[in-house]
């Protein structure tokens, strides 16, 4: 593996990566703030078998706002990866949680989030935050279906304990997908464009 990111199971790895980010925050006094920014990434991809290299890059623009109890986030990101000396350069292989997944080499990501912070004084519970998160991944290959995710839920904060309870409605979500032969390819060519629903509880202790 590499400290920069991922290693492709076909022997393609990242190297010589550069990241930059610029952001500015507008203070609205007692109302809150709005932060806008842009970021970029540029680096090389190395085929460890052949020694050949090519480039990869990603660019993003984001907005974050806090207005009283309301919190809003918007982001657009674009990524292009050019794996050298591979039979099919339309995808790269990335690993997450011990599973290799094919991901479209060229794709756009659209994401948004809306939440509301509710102070609570009920035993150890200090805050409840209902939220709605949306994301969509569009791919450069016209015949590959988009990945779409709706996440509706709430976060309960109690001291060092954080509990996310949500309903996930998605098309092509890698972890809301049957664990069959299509699981590893939903971020590339094997998204069947079917809506699936899952109930999720995530507990964190910090």
Across the structure, where does each feature detected by a protein language model lie?
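Transmembrane beta-barrel strands of outer-membrane/channel proteins
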Residues: 1, 36-42, 65, 74-78, ...
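Solvent-exposed loop segments that connect transmembrane elements
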Residues: 1-13, 48-50, 82-103, 174-191
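Residues that define the transmembrane beta-barrel architecture of outer-membrane proteins
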Residues: 14-18, 55-59, 66, 106-110, ...
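Short loop/turn motifs that connect adjacent beta-strands in outer-membrane beta-barrel proteins
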Residues: 27-34, 69, 118-128, 159, ...
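Transmembrane beta-strands of outer-membrane beta-barrel proteins
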Residues: 32-38, 61, 70-74, 112, ...
């Amino acid at each position: 593996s590499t400290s920069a990111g991922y290693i492709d199971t076909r022997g393609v790895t990242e190297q010589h990566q550069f990241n930059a980010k610029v952001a500015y925050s507008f203070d609205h006094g007692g109302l809150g703030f709005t932060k806008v920014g842009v970021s970029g990434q540029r680096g090389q991809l190395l085929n460890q078998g052949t020694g050949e290299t090519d480039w990869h890059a990603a660019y993003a623009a984001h907005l974050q706002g806090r207005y009283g109890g309301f919190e809003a986030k918007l982001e657009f990101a674009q990524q292009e990866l050019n794996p050298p000396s591979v039979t099919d350069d339309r995808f790269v292989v990335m690993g997450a949680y011990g599973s290799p997944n094919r991901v479209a080499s060229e794709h756009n990501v659209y994401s948004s989030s809306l939440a509301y912070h509710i102070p609570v004084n009920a035993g150890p519970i200090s805050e409840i935050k209902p939220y709605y998160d949306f994301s969509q991944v569009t791919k450069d290959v016209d015949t590959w279906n988009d990945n779409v995710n709706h996440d509706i839920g709430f976060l309960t904060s109690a001291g060092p304990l954080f509990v996310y309870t949500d309903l996930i409605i998605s098309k092509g979500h890698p972890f809301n997908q049957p664990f069959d032969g299509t699981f590893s390819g939903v971020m590339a060519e094997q998204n069947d464009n079917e809506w699936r629903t899952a109930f999720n509880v995530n507990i964190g202790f910090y």
